[in-house]
Amino acid sequence: MKKLILLRNVMILLCFLTVGSNAWAKVRLPNIIGSHMVLQQKSKVKLWGWAAASETITIKTTWDTTTYKAVANNGAHWEAEINTPAAGGSYTITIEGENKIVLEDVLIGEVWVCSGQSNMEWSGDQDLKESINEAPHANQPEIRLFYVSKSTALYPQDNLEGKWVVCSPESMIHFSAIGYFFGKKINSSIKTPVGLINANWGGTPAETWTPAYVIEKDPIIKKGAESLGQYAWWPSNTAIAYNAMIAPLTKFSISGVLWYQGESNVSSYYSYEQL
């Protein structure tokens, strides 16, 4: 009887291992790469993800006839550079290995990150009058929004929570007002699709958004970081917002960054120029 129980347990374990192995073998993408995204125009942009070690990944787009290839390394990571045309779309990207992923409704245009503290975070769901008044007019199919969920980490992460959505009254009302109105202005002025990435957190000091190695190698910045107070309602430890909310974005090609910062660094004004 004991032998039968042992055999059953071994079989169950083998089943779990097989399922787990198959799951890791599948081609996967970080959340920043998905349907409805905007890719930076006229650039070599990186696409990346995970797959079984040594697996060959093929990438095809509908804006040209090139087939791009990448091979997953021993860490199960793959990466490829693809060429993007001038602004336009929508397009489809097909990524295939053991399984196939089809990214639909992809636009090519200008990509901006909206980061910093409270003035950048402010949105319609925080009773901002301008956003509330604008919301009924926010059906903007050429503006795409990616809202990064607030989180912290002790070490740089390779993925984050969030997904690309088409700008609508429902999605815009939760998004950075500064980011939205900036994107709307670009879109209307130069007739170019705009992708906006919302990664901000009210009250946070600049050191929270700065990589640890940058702080450690500069004695003035390090002194300012060590003088920061601790608060229950927002993070203030060095690098922890960067690790969770910015590090996973660093491979994604952008046009620029909208940044609001200052109030939480008043006490360490002497390091602000270096920051």
Predicted regions span which residues?
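Bacterial Sec-dependent N-terminal signal peptides
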Residues: 1-28
